[in-house]
Amino acid sequence: MAFEDLLNDPVIQKYLHELVGPTGMPVAAAPPDGEVTDEELAEELGLELNDVRRALFILYENDLASYRRLRDEDSGWLTYLWTFQYENIPEQLEEEMHRLLEALENRRQYESENEFYLCGECQLRFEFDEAMEFGFECPECGGRLESMENDRLVNAMEQHIEALRDELHVETAEA
């Protein structure tokens, strides 16, 4: 998939935005052909050098950019030449989806295996043991803690888990 195709995909745009944030998005959205210095990018995009460097290092940490160093023989200064590697984005997205699936499965298990109590006044939620320690009285406002049904939350998580499993072609884990 070409850079242009990748960058026109809303899922990939969101992924890049989540990685580098709004200040780094111009860097992520404008990958140059070949090598470029951080100074050249900052000047070309009209951004602060620190914002460009922050975005480049985030892309580097996520295997979406690489660099090589050159030392100026006269001054001894190092110059970093950056190359974007967006061909890794689909693989990175798949890994992210696997992490999300695992987190959702763990959270669903936690939600299913625990009983929760909610303060109707300040909306704080407590596990049964905590609620019992507080005598079923909210430690913040003194309101009564009521048993909370979380079936809708668990069902929504199960739907998301199933959709992710389908997308990733992952079989249902047997407990």
Swiss-Prot record:
GO terms for molecular function: DNA binding. The winged helix domain is involved in binding to DNA in the preinitiation complex. GO terms for biological process: regulation of DNA-templated transcription; transcription initiation at RNA polymerase II promoter. Keywords: DNA-binding, Transcription, Transcription regulation. It comes from Natronomonas pharaonis (strain ATCC 35678 / DSM 2160 / CIP 103997 / JCM 8858 / NBRC 14720 / NCIMB 2260 / Gabara). Monomer. Interaction with RNA polymerase subunits RpoF and RpoE is necessary for Tfe stimulatory transcription activity. Able to interact with Tbp and RNA polymerase in the absence of DNA promoter. Interacts both with the preinitiation and elongation complexes. This is Transcription factor E. Residues 8-90 form the HTH TFE/IIEalpha-type domain. Belongs to the TFE family. InterPro entries: TF_E_archaea, TFE, TFIIE/TFIIEa_HTH, TFIIE_asu, TFIIEa/SarR/Rpc3_HTH_dom, WH-like_DNA-bd_sf, WH_DNA-bd_sf. It comes from the Archaea. Transcription factor that plays a role in the activation of archaeal genes transcribed by RNA polymerase. Facilitates transcription initiation by enhancing TATA-box recognition by TATA-box-binding protein (Tbp), and transcription factor B (Tfb) and RNA polymerase recruitment. Not absolutely required for transcription in vitro, but particularly important in cases where Tbp or Tfb function is not optimal. It dynamically alters the nucleic acid-binding properties of RNA polymerases by stabilizing the initiation complex and destabilizing elongation complexes.
